[in-house]
């Protein structure tokens, strides 16, 4: 009743002299709408917590039997290497695809030494977009029961750089590797999955695809493209029993991120990949994004806050993101100047 009295007083102050019955109806509608809005936010957050901390993901063996294969791109370092090792530990044979043949050979030997699985390797430079490389990849996977595809290959800017100053070769490589390379590889692999009515297509995304990222504009745009493409692909392939998932990730210690120290929000590849593979099919902190997930606990909470509480496309968030990357650029340029000075002495 106190709420109704205050509501009626507000209407009077605004010069809206409604009939008492209409005032009561209006107050009830306003109260109900507010309650439903708050309840929906609370329920969404509970769903996020359950997804991140309680509910298990789909078991990896649901995508293929023992002896089936996983294809991992960008496999020789960082996340790609860790995906390869953990999938081999789970019993999958591994096709390793990356640029450096020597690293692939070393990783293949490590995998076969530690685990009773087979490996195949392909040294392939995705930036070259060479038809012969894709034909060789097709020849390797033809006849294999490929149950899992990990689209991990990717490239970012060397340092945060305004778009107008971005070198053309860097811009071209980012789009060719992140977008075209992922699309061409996926198109080679999924026909077999569609025929077998099972499989997993997992693509590495980024918070850069959620939040417009000034000074990383080309990279951010490439990851936003993958977000839309992967979601569309997920809807197309779901009737075939294929799980498609884009992983939304914040920073991870890696050569690409240039971050070396772990923290609560920056895991190492081993912890991150373990979270990803244990939460397949769970949205984590991305309940508003179909066929997507933020499975690592701190990344999930950050994604929920950014997408459900903040406005990721708003000027405030974009401006803060810009300021952060401007500061990173200044530090990187100062470091480059110091190293240049050391070499000249």
Curated annotation (Swiss-Prot):
GO terms for molecular function: ketoreductase activity; very-long-chain 3-oxoacyl-CoA reductase activity. It catalyses: a very-long-chain (3R)-3-hydroxyacyl-CoA + NADP(+) = a very-long-chain 3-oxoacyl-CoA + NADPH + H(+). GO terms for biological process: fatty acid elongation; secondary metabolite biosynthetic process; sphingolipid biosynthetic process; very long-chain fatty acid biosynthetic process. Keywords: Endoplasmic reticulum, Fatty acid biosynthesis, Fatty acid metabolism, Lipid biosynthesis, Lipid metabolism, Membrane, NADP, Oxidoreductase, Transmembrane, Transmembrane helix. It is a single-pass membrane protein. GO terms for cellular component: endoplasmic reticulum; endoplasmic reticulum membrane. The chain crosses the membrane at residues 26-46. It is found in: Endoplasmic reticulum membrane. InterPro entries: 3_ketoreductase_fungal, NAD(P)-bd_dom_sf, Sc_DH/Rdtase_CS, SDR_fam. SUPFAM superfamilies: NAD(P)-binding Rossmann-fold domains. NADP(+) binds at residues 71, 125, 133, 152, 219, 223, 252, 254. Gene3D superfamilies: NAD(P)-binding Rossmann-like Domain. The keyword Protein biosynthesis does not apply. It holds the Pfam family adh_short. Its main location: endoplasmic reticulum. Pathway: Lipid metabolism; fatty acid biosynthesis. The active site is at residues 219, 223. It is an enzyme of class 1 (oxidoreductase). Component of the microsomal membrane bound fatty acid elongation system, which produces the 26-carbon very long-chain fatty acids (VLCFA) from palmitate. Catalyzes the reduction of the 3-ketoacyl-CoA intermediate that is formed in each cycle of fatty acid elongation. VLCFAs serve as precursors for ceramide and sphingolipids. This is Very-long-chain 3-oxoacyl-CoA reductase. It comes from Aspergillus fumigatus (strain ATCC MYA-4609 / CBS 101355 / FGSC A1100 / Af293) (Neosartorya fumigata). The lineage of its organism: Eukaryota, Fungi, Dikarya, Ascomycota, Pezizomycotina.
């Amino acid at each position: 009743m106190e709420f109704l009295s205050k509501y009626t007083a507000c209407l009077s102050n605004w010069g809206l002299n409604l009939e008492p019955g209409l005032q009561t109806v209006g107050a009830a509608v306003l109260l109900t709408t507010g309650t439903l809005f708050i309840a929906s936010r609370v329920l969404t957050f509970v769903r996020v917590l359950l997804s991140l901390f309680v509910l298990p993901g789909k078991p990896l063996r649901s995508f293929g039997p023992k002896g089936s294969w996983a294809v991992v791109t960008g496999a020789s370092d960082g996340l790609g290497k860790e995906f390869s090792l953990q999938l081999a530990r789970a019993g999958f044979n591994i096709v390793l695809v990356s640029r450096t043949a020597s690293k692939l050979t070393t990783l293949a030997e490590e995998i076969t030494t530690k685990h009773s699985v087979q490996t195949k390797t392909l040294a392939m430079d995705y930036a070259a977009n060479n038809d012969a490389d894709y034909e060789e990849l097709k020849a390797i996977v033809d006849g294999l029961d490929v149950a899992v595809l990990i689209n991990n290959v990717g490239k970012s800017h060397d340092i945060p750089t305004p778009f107008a100053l971005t070198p053309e070769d860097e811009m071209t490589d980012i789009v060719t590797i992140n977008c075209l390379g992922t699309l061409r590889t996926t198109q080679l692999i999924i026909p077999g999955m569609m025929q077998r009515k099972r499989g997993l297509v997992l693509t590495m995304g980024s918070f850069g695809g959620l939040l417009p990222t000034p000074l990383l504009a080309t990279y951010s745009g490439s990851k936003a493209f993958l977000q839309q493409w992967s979601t569309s692909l997920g809807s197309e392939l779901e009737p075939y029993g294929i799980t498609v998932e884009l992983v939304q990730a914040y920073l991870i210690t890696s050569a690409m991120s240039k971050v070396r120290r772990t923290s609560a929000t920056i895991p190492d590849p081993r912890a991150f990949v373990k979270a990803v593979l244990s939460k397949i099919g769970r949205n984590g902190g991305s309940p508003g994004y179909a066929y997507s997930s933020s499975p690592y606990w701190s990344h999930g909470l950050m994604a929920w806050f950014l997408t459900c509480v903040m406005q990721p496309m708003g000027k405030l968030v974009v401006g803060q993101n810009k300021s952060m990357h401007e500061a990173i650029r200044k530090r990187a340029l100062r470091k480059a100047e110091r190293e240049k000075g050391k070499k000249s002495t």
